[in-house]
Amino acid sequence: MNCTEEFIAKMKQKDIVINFVQAWRNDTLEESYARLDKPTRLHAYSVSKSVTSIGVGLAVQEGLLRLDDPVLRFYPEYDPAELAPNLRRMTVRDLLMMGCGSKDKMFFWNDAQRLQCRAWQDYFLRNEFPYEPGTRFEYNNFNSYMCSCIVERAAGCRSEEHTSELQSLTNLV
């Protein structure tokens, strides 16, 4: 039995469902397990938030951005005068703290609009922000998504490339 099979067996004993696992060593895929076929779409909300937050921390450590940077610093192509006043005050920290000031979760749950919209950053930036950023907690997947986009813009590469050193983490179970 290989390590992945052992891991899956342990999780089954604990009634934990695992959909997908990969074991990488030195940029080589050593083992893989997939309970579902490739076209199946899954939501990975919480884990992606954690990895994205680490990516922001790495970018801060590298001097690519600061937590108090305004979100619009990374979107110079937008005219602030055409956007919601509270968006102009929103910082990276506000996004990390789930405090962007949105009126609701926007559309990042299960409605059809999510599948129809292709320009998610533009949708976010042109949305309403009736609340002052940082004053109201709203569990909103867009906060983490925008953090990931900001890391990409600051680092000049895809966020998963920027956080590639995380692939070396071992002994997670």
Predicted stretch roles:
Residues 44, 83-86, 132-139:
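Solvent-exposed loop and edge beta-strand segments that line ligand/cofactor-binding
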Residues 3-37:
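A short, well-structured edge-of-sheet supersecondary motif
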Residues 34-38, 70-79, 109-111:
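Short linear capping/connector segments at secondary-structure termini
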